[in-house]
């Protein structure tokens, strides 16, 4: 979790100190479609763990027809398919033993859809692990990257990119997105275990 937060703040701060950059990763695409990576579990008996994530998608401001779902976790696939959501990728096997390479492979597919203009925004729905008795469903925007206004105050500090801004962002942002996704996977596994222990204690 500290690494997850540090990565998010570092990239936001870096971009805020980079002056005016025009890049698709920052401005978003023209498409109204939104890609959402949805992390749930493959098994039940975990209290409201899975249903709380599904509610982030079905009970929020999203328009069903505008969503492309990249699902990690069979329970999310079942629930969202039943409600008529478009599941473009089912990567539920990742949840059995998440690795960074698994995260990178799925992120590459989502980023490819973004760079091709098939989706204009990318979101991540997962369960934030606070402790074994407290887990919080979260929805965050991955792309376009949002610059932290607080970081723009230090106008005397500017970032210089080598060889140029575009190539640097093409290298940095995919790693940034993949790192956030992998961090979310790790938190989700811990949260699932905590939720299941609570459910068993309550049974």
What are these regions (language model features)?
Residues 1-202:
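C-terminal beta-strand-loop-alpha-helix "lid" module of Rossmann-like NAD(P)-dependent dehydrogenases
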